[in-house]
Regions:
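Conserved RNase H-like, two-metal-ion catalytic cores of nucleic-acid enzymes
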Residues: 1-54, 106-108, 112-202, 393, ...
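Non-catalytic nucleic-acid-binding interfaces of large nucleic-acid enzymes and RNP effectors
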Residues: 1-108, 222-261, 299-316, 324-335, ...
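Short secondary-structure boundary/capping segments
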Residues: 145-147, 214-226, 234, 281-282, ...
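Conserved catalytic core of nucleic-acid polymerases
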Residues: 98, 419, 433, 443-468
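Common nucleic-acid-contacting/processivity interface regions adjacent to the catalytic cores
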Residues: 311-441
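Active-site-proximal helix-loop-helix substrate-binding element of RNase H-like nuclease domains
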Residues: 158-159, 167-171, 175-178, 182, ...
Length: 468
């Protein structure tokens, strides 16, 4: 059996595996003791019986065990497997420095589990939430979340609060699908309750890991609520208990592919869409702002307040002074997110790649991660642990003055092309290399804008040169 959501719960020393089937939500737990972390050293290397660990101001020793499982490195040298007790993955950072050469000691533990234990990841219909926050900028309620908007397969809705809603209920009379609260805290309590009741598999946002998620965690904490409630396992990176709930610097420094809310998949749609766009050779987008992308892809624009056309003024004053536009603006944002995703199959493409690789979701964004998963699964040898190279400075090239040195100077009517990746195919397709240049035009079967546009050619004077 395979699993779609693969989560390492270091606080519990367990893997959590979550999926859905015809009976609803399913999950399974695997204790680290039943699948302990490991790496390799060269056979014949010193075998230390114990190692000293320093953690949270304390020192203690852990027991190290060694096994021969027939593994070799790329050069055919025999390797010895290293494991330890307690079986905590984070101890690997201390252990691997005991030897000059180690192998696969830099593999994330959930990658390791997927490679060793999973044979497939079955397809199922995920519950997806497209979400966005608005928060107050300036004034008495500076920094407070004012509105949380959602779009799901069942429609869209928004949570909002107003300090004067009891006295001015008419401010939301003309806005559909809105639930109103008297305080930010009440709104957040309801949002967390609905999140846990509906239990979405995937939370999809635009730059969410950089802005929205840290803000949500910060405001939950500021309102005396435990941000760990965002996770079905009450485990959120950067949120910990030390006499009280505290936040570490990790909360404001999530990278766009990591999964800080354990048990849910977080997708930054901006990153996935940008990679999809670039990989299809459409050229580099000048802006990744949601309004720009929505206009390019959907021909749609975000709402603009007639009362406060300046964005900064709108975000500072729109909440209380142009409420209807403010709430509709928030709802429209998540509608645009879902449409961009649906019309480009962006999240489904990422999930398909995950099923193809049989890997955790966060391994499916960069070639280095995908390559490591593939080679660990297919290779008959173990790769050396990666080492950070030494940074060295070097002298730049000398540029000669063509007038005094008699070298070649300016050439007129010369064009320079710079395409990202796939150079051979593009040189031939665009007929721009002197080695393969052709003067024989060839008709296109489809519009040259492919893969963006598969329509028939109508009135465009494109030339394509036969180079084969």
């Amino acid at each position: 059996c395979g699993y779609m959501i693969i989560t390492a719960l270091d606080s519990r020393n367990q893997f959590a595996l979550r999926w859905r089937d015809e009976y609803g939500r399913q999950e399974q737990f695997v204790n680290y003791i039943d699948f302990p972390p490991y790496f390799y050293i060269l056979t014949g290397s010193t075998q230390y019986p114990v190692a000293e660990i320093k953690e949270r101001g304390a020192k203690f020793k852990i027991a190290i065990s060694y096994f021969e499982d027939g593994s070799i490195d790329l050069e055919g040298r025999k390797l010895t497997k290293v494991t330890w007790l307690p079986a905590k993955p984070r101890y690997i950072r201390t252990l691997r420095v005991l030897w000059d050469e180690t192998f696969e000691a830099d593999v994330p533990f959930h990658y390791r589990y997927a490679v060793d234990m999973l044979e497939e990841i079955p397809e199922y219909d995920m519950v997806k939430w497209y979400w966005d926050l608005e928060w107050q900028q300036g004034g008495e309620h500076d920094g407070a979340i004012t509105c949380i908007s959602l779009t799901t397969n069942n429609g869209n809705e928004a949570y909002a609060w107003f300090p004067d809603i009891k006295d001015n209920p008419e401010r939301v009379f003309h806005v559909n699908n809105i639930t109103v609260f008297n305080s930010e805290r009440e709104m957040l309590v309801r949002f967390i309750r609905d999140l846990n009741n509906q239990d979405p598999d995937m939370l999809i946002s635009w730059f969410g890991s950089k802005f929205d998620l840290p803000k949500l965690i910060e405001r939950l904490h500021a309102n005396g609520l435990d941000p760990r409630a965002l996770s079905p396992y009450r485990d959120v990176k950067g949120v910990y208990f030390d006499e009280e709930i505290k936040l570490s610097k990790a909360v404001g420094n999530y990278n766009p592919v990591e999964q800080p809310v354990r048990g849910r998949i977080l997708l930054n749609l901006d990153l996935a869409f940008e990679r999809q766009w670039n990989d299809s050779q459409r050229g580099m987008l000048p802006s990744m702002a949601l309004d720009y992308v929505a206009e390019i892809v959907l021909g749609e624009n975000k709402l603009v307040s007639e009362k406060f056309p300046d964005k900064n003024e709108f975000f500072a004053r729109g909440w209380l002074e142009d409420t209807e536009t403010y709430l509709n603006y928030a709802l429209r944002d998540t509608e645009l997110l879902k449409r961009i995703d649906d019309e480009n199959h962006t999240s489904e493409a990422m999930l398909s790649l995950q099923r193809l690789l049989i890997a955790p979701f966060d391994a499916c964004f960069y070639a280095s991660n995908m390559g490591s998963i593939y080679f660990m699964r297919k290779a008959t040898w173990k790769a050396p642990t990666g080492k950070k190279g030494e940074r060295k400075s070097y002298q730049g090239a000398m540029i000669y003055n063509p007038k005094t040195e008699g070298t070649n100077g300016l050439h007129e009517n010369v064009a320079a092309f710079d395409f990202a990746s796939l150079y051979p195919s593009m040189m031939i397709a665009r007929n721009i290399s002197w080695e393969t240049k052709s003067n024989e035009p060839t008709e296109f079967a489809v519009n040259i804008l492919t893969p963006r546009d598969f329509s028939k050619i109508e009135g465009e004077d494109y030339l394509y040169y036969k180079t084969d």
